[in-house]
Amino acid sequence: MAKNLNSVSFTVLLLVLLVASTEILKSDAACFTFLGECGPEPFTGSNADCLACCVALYKSPPVCAGRVEGVPAHCHCYKS
């Protein structure tokens, strides 16, 4: 029994290391650092319009998301 438990523990450890090293579970949660605002106030477009505005203003590598937030609506740009 202890031998089986040891083998299972070792296998789980290898799987955790594999997932961590290959960043399989990388998510959008890493995109949370506020970069700035874009566009007019209030922003009347969608999240896709906001992202296009952010990419045009700040370029693509730093920008990972553009979201319409707040009242009145603002276009907020985020980087990872």
Swiss-Prot record:
GO cellular component assignments: extracellular region
Domain of life: Eukaryota
GO BP field: defense response to fungus; killing of cells of another organism
Subcellular location: Secreted
Keywords noted in UniProt: Antimicrobial, Disulfide bond, Fungicide, Plant defense, Secreted, Signal
Signal peptide coordinates: 1-29
Disulfide bond found in the keyword field: yes
Main location per the UniProt record: secreted
The keyword Disulfide bond is assigned to this record: yes
Disulfide bond positions: C38-C64, C50-C75, C54-C77
Protein family membership: Belongs to the DEFL family.
Record protein name field: Defensin-like protein 206
Organism: Arabidopsis thaliana
